[in-house]
Amino acid sequence: MPAFRSRTSTHGRNMAGARGLWRATGVKDSDFGKPIIAIVNSFTQFVPGHVHLKDLGQLVAREVEAAGGIAKEFNTIAVDDGIAMGHDGMLYSLPSRELIADSVEYMVNAHCADAMVCISNCDKITPGMLMAAMRLNIPAVFVSGGPMEAGKVTLGDGRTVKMDLIDAMVAAADEKVSDDDLTRIEQAACPTCGSCSGMFTANSMNCLTEALGLSLPGNGSTLATHAYRKELFLEAGRRAVELCRRYYEQEDEGVLPRAIATKEAFENAMALDIAMGGSTNTVLHILAAAQEGGVDFTMDDIDALSRRVPCLCKVAPNKADVHIEDVHRAGGIMSILGELDRGGLLHRDTRTVHAPTLGAAIDQWDIGRSNAPEARELFLAAPGGVPTQVAFSQSSTWDTLDTDRETGVIRSVATPFSKDGGLAVLKGNLAPDGCIVKTAGVDESILVFAGPAKVFESQDAAVYGILNGGVQAGDVVVIRYEGPKGGPGMQEMLYPTSYLKSKGLGKACALITDGRFSGGTSGLSIGHASPEAASGGPIGLVREGDRIEIDIPNRTITLAVPEAELAARRAEQDAKGWKPAGPRKRKVSQALKVYAQFASSADKGAVRVLPE
C-alpha cells in the first residue's frame, strides 16, 4: 500500500530535526504515524464571503483530530471581485486564481500533507483550490462558507423588494432612483456574511463542486448563517480522514480527485451549470481545472452540452426575485441534478466523496424522489432575516418545501424555462475559437441581433461612453484588449452591463468583449471572445460602424466585413502590433506582466502556458 506522504517528514533518523519542528507546532509522540490533513482556509476580513471563516478551520481541525488525523491549517489569499470592480484592482482578480492554486501546491507539497479540506467560497478561491486539488491528486473534500441571505428593502414608495449587490450597482447609475432610496438599497443589499446571494460566480462554482462529486450535498445552497451548515464542516473533516485511510491503507485510488472528477463528472458539472444558468466565469474555471487534472474537456464539449440541456432554473440576475435561498428551499443542487437525471442528461455512475456514486447521492437527497428525513430537514433551512457576520447563527425554517416542478424555482425537463440551456458557445469569424453568452439572462426579443459596432479600447472608455450618451439603442458595444494578456488579467465588465441597464439599453444593445463578465451580468453580453485581441484575434480588427450579427439559436457570431478587407486590416495590424489604438491610463505591475507573459486565451481557461 502507498505510504502516507507525511512519512517523508515524520519518520527516520534523518528527520529528527523535522520532528522537532512538528513537535513545536503541537504534534505529540503518539501523533506520528497519523495522516496529516491540510486545512486550506481562506479567511479574510476583506471579503464578506470569507469574513466568517476565521474559526471554521479549527472547527474542522478538531473533527479531523477526533477522527484520528493531524490537522494543520494554513490560509490562501482571497480577492473580493465586487470591491475590486470598476478600477485597476480588477486586473488582479483572475490572476489570483493561479496564485491560490500555486500556494496550495507549495504548502501541501512542502510539508508533505496527506489530504486536504478546502474551505473556499468566493469567485477565484474555489476555482484556485479546485485546480490545486486536481494538480496534487491527494484526497480532498471541499466545503464552502455558504451563500449570503438575500437583501430586503422597503423603498420610499412603500414597496418591499428582495434584492442583491447588483441592484445597488444598477440603482447607483439610474437617475430615477432618489438618493434616499439608493441609501436604503445600499444598506440592505448585502445583509449577512456569505457569497453574494444570486447565481453569481461564487455560488455557481460552489454548486458545481456538488456535481463534480468533491463536496457534500447542500454545499452550494445552505446559507452561511444557518446552523445546518455547521454539519457540512464537521462532516468534511471526518470524510477527509476516511478518504485518506481508504487511499493510503486500503489502496483505493477511487477516492482521489482525478478518479472522482473524471470527464463524465465535468460533463455533469457543465450540464448543471447550463441547466441553472450559472455564471459564464464557470466556463473558464471548469476548463482550467480539467486541464490541471489531464481531463480532455474543451469548449466543444460545452457547446455540445449546451445544445441538449434545457434551462431548469433561473436565479438572480436572470430572475430578479429568486435567490440561492429559494433554490435551497426547492431542493438545492441535488434536486436540479435529479431533474437532469430523470431527463437522461446525467452520468449517474461518477464517484463522490460522500456516496458510492452520484446517482446514489441523488436517490438519497433529491426531494423529488426521496423521503429521507435528513433531506427534508436540510432543505427547509431558511434565512433568518437578521444582519450578521456570524456563521451558523440562526436556525429558521421554511414552512414548506417548493416541490412544484411545473412553475416553481426548479423545473422538470418536461416543463423547463426554455428548451435551450442557460449558457451557449457562439463561433464565427469574430470569434473562431468561441465566445460565451449566458442565454438565461438574454431577453427572447434579442436572441437574434444585429447592429453597428461601437468600439472601445478599454472598459474605462466604454463606461465613459455609455454614461455620456455615446451608445445608442441598436448598437453593438465592443470592448477589446481586456483579455488575459491584453488587460492583463481579463477584467469583468459588470459596470458597462449595469450602466446599459440603468440607461434603459439592457434589451436594446449587445456587448462583446475578450474580457469576461461578473456572474451578476445579464443581457446580451458576450464574453471570452477567442482569440483575444492581444493575441491577434479578429475582435482586434473591428472598426467603428462595422455590422455585427449575433444568432444565438444557431450559435453564430459574424463580423459582416468582406474577407479581403479583413485580410488587409490584419496586415496593417500586424505591422502596428496588436495593442490598443491609443494609450491607456493603466499601470501594469511586474506581477501582472508575468501573468500576461504566460496567459492563454479564454477558450483554454486562461491558464498559464509555459514554453516547451
UniProtKB/Swiss-Prot annotation:
Catalytic activity: (2R)-2,3-dihydroxy-3-methylbutanoate = 3-methyl-2-oxobutanoate + H2O; (2R,3R)-2,3-dihydroxy-3-methylpentanoate = (S)-3-methyl-2-oxopentanoate + H2O
Active-site residues, record numbering mapped to chain: S518
Gene Ontology MF, one: 2 iron, 2 sulfur cluster binding
Cofactor note: Binds 1 [2Fe-2S] cluster per subunit. This cluster acts as a Lewis acid cofactor.
EC number: 4.2.1.9
Enzyme type, top EC level: lyase
Family annotation (Pfam families): ILV_EDD_C, ILVD_EDD_N
Organism, scientific name: Cereibacter sphaeroides (strain ATCC 17023 / DSM 158 / JCM 6121 / CCUG 31486 / LMG 2827 / NBRC 12203 / NCIMB 8253 / ATH 2.4.1.)
S-S bonds: none
Classification via NCBIfam families: ilvD, PRK12448.1
Name the record gives this protein: Dihydroxy-acid dehydratase
Family that this chain belongs to: Belongs to the IlvD/Edd family.
Cellular component GO terms, alphabetical: cytosol
Lineage, broadest ranks: Bacteria, Pseudomonadati, Pseudomonadota, Alphaproteobacteria, Rhodobacterales
Keywords: 2Fe-2S, Amino-acid biosynthesis, Branched-chain amino acid biosynthesis, Iron, Iron-sulfur, Lyase, Magnesium, Metal-binding
Keyword check for Lyase: yes
Cofactor: [2Fe-2S] cluster; Mg(2+)
UniProt-annotated binding residues for Mg(2+): D81, D123, K124, E492
Residues the entry annotates as binding [2Fe-2S] cluster: C122, C196
GO terms of biological process kind: isoleucine biosynthetic process; L-valine biosynthetic process
Modified sites of kind N6-carboxylysine: K124
Quaternary structure, from the entry: Homodimer.
Coiled-coil ranges per UniProt: none
Associated pathway: Amino-acid biosynthesis; L-isoleucine biosynthesis; L-isoleucine from 2-oxobutanoate: step 3/4; Amino-acid biosynthesis; L-valine biosynthesis; L-valine from pyruvate: step 3/4
Role according to the record: Functions in the biosynthesis of branched-chain amino acids. Catalyzes the dehydration of (2R,3R)-2,3-dihydroxy-3-methylpentanoate (2,3-dihydroxy-3-methylvalerate) into 2-oxo-3-methylpentanoate (2-oxo-3-methylvalerate) and of (2R)-2,3-dihydroxy-3-methylbutanoate (2,3-dihydroxyisovalerate) into 2-oxo-3-methylbutanoate (2-oxoisovalerate), the penultimate precursor to L-isoleucine and L-valine, respectively.
InterPro entries found in the cross-reference section: Dihydro-acid_dehy_C, DihydroxyA_deHydtase, DiOHA_6PGluconate_deHydtase_CS, ILV_EDD_C, ILV_EDD_N, IlvD/EDD_N
